[in-house]
Amino acid sequence: MNSDPRLHIIAVTGIVEKNGKYLILKRSEREVAYPGFWTVPGGKLVRHEYENLALTEKTDAWYDIVSRTLEKEIMEEAGLEIEGIRYLTDMVFIRPDNIPALVLSYYCRHKAGNVALGKDMVDYAWIMPEEGKNYQIIPGILDEIIMVDKILKN
């Protein structure tokens, strides 16, 4: 068990919509959590990736790190540019290595690019929500895709 209960992994995920379909990616078998499952793009907030960025003027803080991380992760994992990032929900789970992970879930629209898989993903699909049952998707993610679909259709 983690010796410091204050420590969590913080991750951000993005449900990418394009023409009424949603991007899912298949994780490699090397992943610690949910190897070989389908997911949406995203990744961890990593200190060394933002601490060299310019600080916000007159503060000692970095702003928009979550959205900037999401843009970076979607580019790295899927080769896509996105726009219109909006908050959806959040959740916490305990990984198989006993480290708690806080996941911030967002949705966005495809802006440009064709899918080009990064090193941690082995396949992709653009799906309608009702097609999700045909894939072994990480629990909860299909529910989030359905939530986004309802939001965007209203």
Locate the predicted segments by residue:
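Conserved Nudix-box catalytic region and its N-terminal flanking loop in Nudix hydrolases
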Residues: 21-72
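NUDIX/MutT-family hydrolases
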Residues: 105-107, 116-148
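Active-site-adjacent beta-strand/loop module that shapes the phosphate/pyrophosphate-binding cleft
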Residues: 83, 89-114
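Short loop/turn microsegments at loop-to-beta-strand junctions
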Residues: 11-12, 65, 122
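Short secondary-structure junctions
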Residues: 77-84
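A cytosolic small-molecule/anion-sensing beta-strand core signal
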Residues: 18
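Acidic, metal-coordinating catalytic segment for phosphate/diphosphate chemistry
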Residues: 1-13, 30
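Residue-level preference for beta-strand/loop junctions
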Residues: 8, 66, 100-102
